[in-house]
A protein has these predicted regions:
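Feature captures hydrophobic
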Residues: 1-126
Length: 126
């Protein structure tokens, strides 16, 4: 199976499929209501900012979208932002998404308390 390049339109759509087929995520996030912008900041391995949108609702990902630098972005309840290299660590399982916030490798904009109550869902999401 060919790996899908991160970040890309194909990747975020496949991510939606994986989330929607995860029984563990559905259980962990059955109460969650909120949308995110996942912001991938440039670093020495990525030369432009990429933003991916996720609409998460009661254990399902209802919609996703992909934006490049300069595109108009939707308003969301949350933004989770970090460098491309740190995003790869999260995707590969080398960095827990919540620990990423606590160690300032990622910045969370939005109700931090709500996200901290959803640590199991956050872990299942990645």
């Amino acid at each position: 199976m060919e790996l899908i390049k991160f970040p890309s339109k194909e990747w975020i759509h496949e991510f939606k499929n994986v989330v929607n087929n995860s029984v563990d995520y559905k259980e962990a996030a059955k109460w969650w209501e909120g949308d995110f912008l996942f912001v991938i900041e440039p670093d020495d391995k990525l030369d432009k900012k990429i933003v991916m949108y996720l609409d998460l609702w009661h254990g399902d990902c209802r919609s996703v979208d992909y934006f490049e630098e300069g595109d108009s972005l939707p308003e969301t309840e949350f933004q989770y932002a970090g460098t491309y290299s740190n995003w790869l660590k999260v995707i590969e399982g080398a960095l827990d998404p919540i620990k990423g916030i606590l160690t300032r490798k990622f910045k969370l904009v939005g109700d931090k308390g709500k996200v901290m109550r959803a640590t199991k869902a956050a872990k299942e999401l990645v």
